[in-house]
Curated annotation (Swiss-Prot):
Summary of subunit composition and partner proteins: In the active form, heterodimer of a light chain and a heavy chain; disulfide-linked.
Function: Endopeptidase with selective post-Arg cleavage site. Functions in the innate immune response to fungal and Gram-positive bacterial infections. Upon pathogen infection promotes nodulation; a cellular defense response in which hemocytes surround and isolate invading pathogens forming aggregates called nodules. Involved in activating nodule formation in response to infection with M.luteus, E.coli or S.cerevisiae. Able to bind the microbes M.luteus, E.coli or S.cerevisiae. According to another report, does not bind microorganisms.
Name by which UniProt lists this protein: CLIP domain-containing serine protease HP8
Domain Clip: 26-75
Superkingdom in the source lineage: Eukaryota
Amino acid sequence: MKTPFEKIRIISCILVIVSTNVVGQKCNGGANCIPLEECTDLFQQLKQGNSPQLTRLLRGLHCGFEDLNSPKICCPPEFLARRSAFSSAGTNSNPTSILPNEKVCGIQNNDRIFGGIQTEIDEHPWMALLRYDKPLGWGFYCGGVLIAPMYVLTAAHCVKGSDLPSSWQLSQVRLGEWNTSTETDCVEGDCSGPVQDIPVQQIIAHENYDPNDKDQQNDIALLRLSRNAQFNDFVSPICLPTSNELRQNEFESDYMEVAGWGKTETRSESDVKLKVRVPIVNREECANVYSNVDRRVTNKQICAGGLAGRDSCRGDSGGALMGQSPKANNWYVFGVVSYGPSPCGTEGWPGVYTRVGSFMDWILSKLEQ
């Protein structure tokens, strides 16, 4: 039960946050205008402490007052996920309602340094590390991205790949990490909160993925977490390309970004999250390159990189190829790191990524409340 002081503190905070907003705005994206306290996950985050990101979010969601002391907000469906889990079972009839909308997904607040190798402490807050338990310990050997409070997108080869030792068990996902060698990450007084280590409840690899397929078709998987991730400045979801425009875009002549710790099944490169900008490569050109080693690149894959030393070497196996929306600057995941040349970063040999847009129907079919 909340103490009177706690309730007054929360309500006072909200009144300050929303007082500049227009009351009575309509809700978009399947959200409902309800009292803040009924938007359970968001209310719990506010009780844990306010942040600039949470302030901006609440300002954008405010839609009126129940009474003088009860502000109402357009509660995004993802913040009702915990409550819904007890009232529904099985496949969700409207899976897109589980996905965060553009007021929540793909947003980062740092002043980014373009061309840098090391990320800022709160850059790409959707990046995830996959923890594997081994007979003699544990370690992080793949990556992924948070796409919803209870879902991480990764590569199928990270959960059933031919290089994955049978004695390893994927057990947890870590969110909110920046430097794996320190307990608390701080840069010039800006400190992240504690990391979120969340057990994996269910592993969902694409049914048509074959670990022994050298072309690595259908190399995509989802991880359902045992509980909701708590969104903050260092943990938030990336957007998925749900629109037909983004699903079908070839992105030729564009640059995208790969980030991660350089962790794969066979190497562990960096303690600190790294990034690199890579050019999108014409698929026909990419297919011609890989035909020299008898590998087939299809329209369900996307190629990027091919610059000496600047490939997905800095990304993680199962991590993301990311780009920003030209309309709203939100970040989207367009590719999942699948395979590339050996040695990594060989000039003229781009990395190959699973095209997320080609698997949106599959992703949506697997999402449950």
